[in-house]
Amino acid sequence: RQDMVDESVCYITDNNCNGGKCLRSKACHADPWEL
């Protein structure tokens, strides 16, 4: 798990969750570090 990524709020910009538009979505959590 990446500590910079909050479970309830995800920042989606590209393949990573590094800032950008704040969306509550699981799209960000589908990344390898969440699995």
Swiss-Prot record:
Subcellular localization: Secreted
GO cellular component: extracellular region
Primary localization: secreted
Single GO term (MF): toxin activity
Tissue expression pattern: Expressed by the venom gland.
Gene3D superfamilies documented for this protein: 4.10.40.60
Coiled coil residues, start to end: none
Disulfide linkage: C10-C22, C17-C28
Pfam short name (any one): Toxin_28
Keywords: Disulfide bond, Secreted, Toxin
Region (Keys region for toxin activity): 31-33
Annotated function: Insecticidal toxin.
Family classification: Belongs to the neurotoxin 16 (SFI) family.
UniProt-recorded name of the protein: U1-segestritoxin-Sf1a
Taxonomic source organism: Segestria florentina
